[in-house]
Amino acid sequence: MKIAVIGYSGNVDETPVKQLGEICEELGHKIAIKKHILINGGTDGIMALVSRSARNASGEVIGIVAGLESGNKHLSFEFKTGMDSSMRSVLMMYNVDAIISVGGKAGTGLELFSAYLMGIPIVLLRGTGGWTDRIAGVLIEGKYLDERKLVEIKNSWNVDDAIELAENSKRR
């Protein structure tokens, strides 16, 4: 299964990424030991942390990188898109079976909306801040972004449940 982890970009030693280090380490490690392929934007922040822990557990990590910039050193494979980060995010959604969201700013919000419109299962790892927690407050019936009910957005409060929810979801 190809699982995307989306969330905050930025320096791993600064707020808010630093506070999520343990969660990201656990998430990347457990995705890898379950033999799933980890896909992300391939650069810094949450992406670097989950990539590092997945690679340390001998997992496969694909970075779908914006523009022509270099991805982080923990990627098994780096795909330079030549696209801005918004378009890169949409391209990434076409290549995943499910996403797990950890915190995040506007780019994460874009990825959440794109995944929803494409019928990609979404798991919110709650308590991580940003759009991951913020979007939960606007969900219809606690699980849909709009009346079309394209895909159920699931809430998790720990890494094990987040992965299990992703594994048990089907892309529309």
Residue spans of the language-model regions?
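Acidic/glycine-enriched connector segments
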Residues: 21, 25, 32-33, 41-114, ...
